[in-house]
Amino acid sequence: MSKVRIYTLAKDLGVDNHKMLEILDGLGVSYKSVSSTIDEENVEIIKQILADEAAEGGDAAPAAASAPAAATAEPEEADETPAAAAQADAEPASDLPHRAPVVTIMGHVDHGKTSLLDYIRKTRVAAKEAGGITQHVGAFEAKTSKGKIVFIDTPGHEAFTTIRARGANVADIAIIVIAADDSLMPQTREAIAHAQAAKVPMLIAINKVDLPQADPEKVKTDLTQLNLVPEEYGGDVIVVPVSAKTGEGVEDLLEYISLTAELEDLRADPKGQFSGVIIEGRVDKQAGVLATVMVQEGTLHVGDFLVVGENYGKIKAMTDSNGGRIKEAGPSTPVQILGFSEVPSSGETVVSAKNEHAAREIVAQRASDRRDEEDARERRKAQRSLADLLGPLGEVHTVNLILRADTQGSLEAIQGILARKETEDVKLNVMLAGIGAPTEGDVLLASTAEAQILCFNVTPSAAVTKVAETKEIPIKAYRIIYEMIDEVDRLIKGNLDPVFEEQYLGRAEVRMVIHHPKSGNIAGSYVTDGMFKRNAKAKVTRGKEVVYEGTVVGLKRFKDDVREVQQGYECGINIDWNDVQEGDIIEASEMVEVEPR
């Protein structure tokens, strides 16, 4: 009995993939994705359902009760219903028009990423446009039967993660290219880890299948070691054999990209407020500052004012992926912009302003907000309640690790020990484990995923150390394996729910109340015991009754603001409470972390 893939049947019958999955859900047919196969019996049932709907003028998916008992999936397919999940996540934005998917291609340096992009360019971009595309905006648009696909041509996964580290999600789909004659290499594992950290759908392209020594089955088997199980093995990872040299499988890859985009239901409002992301910025000797922007929402026009971080500019000229001048650009369109005075950083968000005055106001407000945040950060830390410090009870903490070692044996030994170190409260997640010194990509991944980099018998280069210092990512290197394990023990201990105790600081007697026009009533006090600190907890006692509990928001000695006042000195105490009275006793305390008992 022959079988047919779901997406192929949907295409042949002229319905979209979501509709096809709804019908299968109604029939009770199990599948893993739109590339799963169904048998002839179910194909005939689906055709009849669609014919009946066409005759009735309806489009509802059949109820499960109407499904024949024999309607079952192939045994290798798993019990999941993506259509139902997609419906549950549906947003009102479903009325918005679809946009093109934005795809990034990553993988090991010699596995053919550039060759694959070049082949797609050659066959999917008009000949007059293909030359010199990369020198314009680092991206290009490929035309397919399902619409356009935008490919970002960035130099490796490090650039991808730099954008992610700033909180931007510029890519919708990641293609991991793996050579059929080489299988998984260190950079392949890194690329997969970066894509997983970004939480974007992944497609695996096994390249160079035209070579005599190609072994795509080995690649698929090796992928399972990373918990990436191909569909033909019963998993949910789409694996496409391709050849960037002959073009074999490239059409299938483009089809799978379109199918993934359809299931992701990518939409944007071209009439809405503009927003975008900086892909890269550079200085051209002749033109000046150029910025590549991916339009995500709204439409960009020449003459618009844009704000990036604490800088703004007016679009003087705009270039599309072909190097041609354009006047406007909608969602999922990469453009190169001339108009900024300073080079923006990759991953920064871009918003529009009505005019220059509005742009200046946005920049001024952002600068003010940044200063306020810096000023308030210490105070917020000091004023956290005990509940804030403890966090949710029973929460399982995850420690993300990036491991580097000198040999595979060392790496396996370390991972074996780590597997025995996990507790009910703390989970150790090894995001990446590789042989050799840590790379800049490791640092960027650690920055994005809040991971720790631990090295055994290898040390980072000066360049990597400099990047790590800039990103404030510590790289810890060890020569003795148990010193590394001791560090892991410290990390586990540091991720356990902390234990805090309230410790007494001091006591003061209110001798006069001073009214301040801005700060309200200040307690003119004498510290009779211990000391007082700014931001300490304060408890006011009147007689034997506690009348107020709050925070010491300010301390003064004469006219000077001070951080603390010792026993035997007078001071002004501001507890942000106007009902303080002479004779009140103010007691100060602070929350101090103690060793778990």
UniProtKB/Swiss-Prot annotation:
The keyword Nucleotide-binding applies. It comes from Deinococcus radiodurans (strain ATCC 13939 / DSM 20539 / JCM 16871 / CCUG 27074 / LMG 4051 / NBRC 15346 / NCIMB 9279 / VKM B-1422 / R1). Its main location: cytoplasm. CDD domains: IF2_eIF5B, IF2_mtIF2_II, mtIF2_IVc. The keyword Coiled coil does not apply. Residues 57-73, 81-95 have a biased composition (Low complexity). It is found in: Cytoplasm. GO terms for biological process: translational initiation. Keywords: Cytoplasm, GTP-binding, Initiation factor, Nucleotide-binding, Protein biosynthesis. InterPro entries: EF-G-like_DII, IF2_II, IF2_N, P-loop_NTPase, Small_GTP-bd, T_Tr_GTP-bd_dom, TF_IF2_bacterial-like, TIF_IF2. This is Translation initiation factor IF-2. Gene3D superfamilies: 1.10.10.2480, P-loop containing nucleotide triphosphate hydrolases (3.40.50.300), Translation factors (2.40.30.10), Translation initiation factor IF- 2, domain 3 (3.40.50.10050). Belongs to the TRAFAC class translation factor GTPase superfamily. Classic translation factor GTPase family. IF-2 subfamily. The lineage of its organism: Bacteria, Thermotogati, Deinococcota, Deinococci, Deinococcales. One of its GO terms (cellular component) is cytoplasm. One of the essential components for the initiation of protein synthesis. Protects formylmethionyl-tRNA from spontaneous hydrolysis and promotes its binding to the 30S ribosomal subunits. Also involved in the hydrolysis of GTP during the formation of the 70S ribosomal complex. Residues 98-271 form the tr-type G domain. Disulfide bonds: none annotated. Residues 132-136 are annotated as: G2. Residues 57-96 are annotated as: Disordered. Residues 153-156 are annotated as: G3.
